[in-house]
């Protein structure tokens, strides 16, 4: 059976992995998943990530905890395959009043809402992370 929304699956694996206090999680790899993992690592929401090259590449994400509590409080898919959500540069949302991030897919790659605002870019809102 094919997966309908691999990004939602990735976010669910992160959410479930942290709820179960897992050290690391793995999933099938794709360019978009690696770009999202890169943003999460740069912003400090996950410890690290790596790509395991096999017959089918796997993405392994090392989760991050602070005082035995998950760093990611909430992670929510916004733009879905059935309902794509696009925003112009002046419409980009501020998650939790600027405390969280929105991950945005722009013409210059996947970045946070802050980076997209600085670049003067809009794009597809992939998810909110707080």
Curated annotation (Swiss-Prot):
Question: What is a GO molecular function of this protein?
Answer: structural constituent of ribosome
**Record's keyword terms, sorted:** Ribonucleoprotein, Ribosomal protein, RNA-binding, rRNA-binding
This protein's GO cellular component annotations are: ribonucleoprotein complex; ribosome
- Classify the source by domain of life: Bacteria
Q: Biological process GO annotation list? A: translation
Entries under Pfam families matching the protein: Ribosomal_S8 (PF00410)
Q: Which family does it belong to?
A: Belongs to the universal ribosomal protein uS8 family.
Quaternary structure and partners? Part of the 30S ribosomal subunit. Contacts proteins S5 and S12.
Q: Which HAMAP family match?
A: Ribosomal_uS8_B
Role description = One of the primary rRNA binding proteins, it binds directly to 16S rRNA central domain where it helps coordinate assembly of the platform of the 30S subunit.
Name of the protein: Small ribosomal subunit protein uS8
């Amino acid at each position: 059976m094919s997966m309908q929304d691999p990004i939602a699956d990735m976010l669910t694996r992160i959410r479930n992995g942290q709820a179960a206090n897992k050290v690391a999680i793995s999933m099938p790899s794709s360019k978009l998943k690696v770009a999202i993992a890169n943003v999460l690592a740069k912003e400090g929401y996950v410890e690290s990530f790596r790509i395991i090259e096999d017959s089918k590449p796997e993405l392994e994400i090392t989760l991050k905890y602070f005082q035995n509590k998950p760093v990611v409080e909430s992670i929510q898919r916004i733009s879905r395959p059935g309902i794509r959500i696009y925003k112009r540069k002046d419409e980009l949302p501020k998650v939790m009043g600027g405390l969280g991030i929105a991950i945005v897919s722009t013409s210059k790659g996947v970045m946070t809402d802050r980076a997209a605002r600085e670049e003067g870019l809009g794009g597809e809102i992939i998810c909110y992370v707080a």
